[in-house]
Amino acid sequence: KIKANVIPDEKAMQKVSEVLDDPSAPLSVKVWTDKKEYREGDKIKMYIKGNKPFYVRVVYKDAAGKLLQLLPNPYRRDNDFNGGVVYAIPSGNDKFELEVNPPFGEESIAVYTSTSQLGDLDLKEEGGVYQVKTKSKDIGIKTRSVKIKEVTEGKAQQASEFFEGKAVVKTGK
């Protein structure tokens, strides 16, 4: 057996952090939760942070496979965020909480992000969020689909950047 003490290299960790926050780097968005495991009745809080301004769609998949779009939602339609800022979900005008109830098991939070507006999904309003009617396998494709918008004169066209991230949590009694 080998025993070793691991001492984190602060300079290396700082360098990695700077790269992840660099707005000139390709779009990168981190998603995480306040805990990895939740019990019945717990409230899930999630966070997102991008390295540059971005648009986001946040989709929650419960243990039964039901998909809910948390952002944008009926009360918080704006889905554009600044880079370098940590955002909590739910917060602000959100009219929902993520309370752990059966069925229990592995659940996930997926973020679909872009530097330009996102394509549309087939949604049905359900309380303070939307139920996603689009098939799970098609969400990424439809999110990245083209949105027609007017071009303002003199403004150079930029290619859109996309990023998908995911956080997985376990729920139980």
Name each region found by the language model:
Residues 1-173:
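Secretory-pathway glycoprotein ectodomains that are cysteine- and/or Ser/Thr/Pro-rich
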